Regions:
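Membrane-integral, polyisoprenol-dependent glycosyltransferases
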Residues: 1-254
């Protein structure tokens, strides 16, 4: 929450950042997960802080080495596998690509970041393999690869894709109720134009969106879509998108 406040306060003002932090701290899902001793909240914190650090690195033109970001990525990798490292890199890479950075430069830069963030986890995995042997290796394969492919040897939190929508809506109580009530008091405009026109306006809107809002939107969309792919779905898997949803909710409430 403090990292999110600092990130948005520098770029969007203290009022919006404070409200964003308050919403993040007080929604049902974050509060519930934060009071339980589980790895999911730690994973979310490390992934979100890695996203903030990689964004700052992008602001600097990918110059230098984002050591703090690499440490966060390494910690996320150790917490719950390579997905903790891959998703922040994916979000930031897509953001920079949309903003016109050359694909080759993005690829090489994030390849280096990815390899650097694998050093500490590799040391731990080697040590764990020396103790656990083939049984440990099979567990890693099942949890990190077969879970995504839906080929685990046992059923684990299998739910349909719409389950994620339900958990986010429920998890953001009481703010989802506030948003739903506010819909009755908004002024609506008549919908007009063809579907192609809507698509063109949407593309223009995305291109003209300021950097912070676009980065926050991509963090929500890409992480959410990724966690809709595997059969295994839990509400805590989506915790990394909650600070970014809080940013848009804060904008909406101030509006």
């Amino acid at each position: 929450v403090l990292a999110g406040y600092g990130f948005y306060a520098r770029r969007r003002g203290t009022e919006l950042a404070f409200l964003m932090g308050l919403i993040t701290l007080t929604n049902f899902e974050v509060h519930r997960a934060g009071t339980n001793c589980r790895v999911d909240m730690l994973l979310a914190a490390l992934m979100v802080m890695a996203l903030y650090q990689l964004y700052r690195w992008g602001e600097k033109g990918l110059k230098g080495v984002p050591w703090l970001g690499i440490l966060c990525l390494s910690g996320a990798f150790l917490t719950k596998g390579p997905v903790g490292m891959a998703l922040p890199c994916l979000v930031t890479a897509v953001f920079l690509w949309i903003r016109g950075v050359h694909f080759g430069r993005i690829f090489l830069s994030f390849l280096g970041i990815g390899l650097a963030s694998c050093v500490l986890p590799l040391v731990w995995y080697v040590a764990a393999y020396q103790q656990g042997g083939e049984e440990f290796l099979q567990l890693v394969l099942e949890e990190n690869v077969l879970r995504l492919l839906g080929k685990m040897s046992y059923s684990s939190h299998e739910n349909p894709a719409y389950y994620n929508v339900i958990t986010v809506v429920a998890g953001y109580a009481p703010y989802t109720l506030l948003v739903l009530l506010s819909l009755f008091f908004l002024k609506y405009h008549k919908v007009s134009g063809k579907l192609s026109g809507w698509w063109n306006r949407f593309r223009t809107y995305i291109r003209e969106m300021d950097d912070v809002r676009l980065f926050s939107l991509l963090s929500i969309v890409l992480i959410f879509v990724f966690y809709c792919i595997p059969k295994s779905k839990r509400s805590v898997y989506l915790l990394p998108i909650y600070p970014f949803l809080a940013y848009f909710l804060a904008e909406y409430l101030l509006y």
